[in-house]
Amino acid sequence: MIKKVQHALILNELTKLRDKNTTTSQFRMALNQITSLLFFEATKQLPLATVEVETPFAKTKGYKLKNDIVLVPIMRAGLGMIDAIVRYSDKIRVGHLGIYRQTQTTSVISYYKKMPENISDSHVIILDPMLATGTTLLTAIKSIKEDKPIKISVIAIVAAPEGINKVEKMHPHVDIFLAAIDEKLNDNRYIIPGLGDAGDRLFGTK
């Protein structure tokens, strides 16, 4: 399922991400704000267990998450999305995937994988600001499926139709939460209008 999340604050912060004059610190802050809002949407239907809790005055019914959440940022730009989420639950763990797309081809290189122990009872959320050709995300999903999590979702900021269509065709049960669906990919496979290289803008590199 593709879910473009409609929210005034997302549009406000997305404009900052797109602006070429936005500073590195401003870019980080805007990325955090959008990631938080997308995370709320991605998790609002998570299964809950009923528990009894005692307030200072009485016992009452409460709820807790049934399953852990495992965040898997795709290095390096996905690393900038972690802090926006980890503060929301003590049931959040973090794995890492190192994958990059070769600029002149559609092939991808996987160079690092480190996952929490036993994620078979967890909901995995892949974090990557950009969904361009879809090849990086397909590689990530394939790798994570080897660990047999309950569910895989994706939080991305901006996506191109080409990448969305490719991933949805291969993995229709993976939910993808987005702030924007842009026009197209250019000849160099960058998203247009996009927001530039998210990793460079996030970390102040070129």
UniProtKB/Swiss-Prot annotation:
Gene that this sequence comes from: upp
Notes on activation and inhibition: Allosterically activated by GTP.
Catalytic activity: UMP + diphosphate = 5-phospho-alpha-D-ribose 1-diphosphate + uracil
Sequence positions that bind uracil: I191, G196, D197, A198
Pfam families, per the entry: UPRTase
GO molecular function: GTP binding; magnesium ion binding; uracil phosphoribosyltransferase activity
Cofactor note: Binds 1 Mg(2+) ion per subunit. The magnesium is bound as Mg-PRPP.
Organism (species): Mycoplasma genitalium (strain ATCC 33530 / DSM 19775 / NCTC 10195 / G37)
Protein name: Uracil phosphoribosyltransferase
GO BP term (any one): uracil salvage
Pathway in which this enzyme or protein is active: Pyrimidine metabolism; UMP biosynthesis via salvage pathway; UMP from uracil: step 1/1
Binding site for 5-phospho-alpha-D-ribose 1-diphosphate: R76, R101, D128, P129, M130, L131, A132, T133, G134, T135, T136, D197
Keywords: Allosteric enzyme, Glycosyltransferase, GTP-binding, Magnesium, Nucleotide-binding, Transferase
Cofactor(s) needed by this chain: Mg(2+)
Family assignment from sequence similarity: Belongs to the UPRTase family.
Role summary: Catalyzes the conversion of uracil and 5-phospho-alpha-D-ribose 1-diphosphate (PRPP) to UMP and diphosphate.
Alphabetized InterPro entries for the sequence: PRibTrfase_dom, PRTase-like, Upp_B, UPRTase/APRTase, Ura_phspho_trans
Keyword hit for Nucleotide-binding: yes
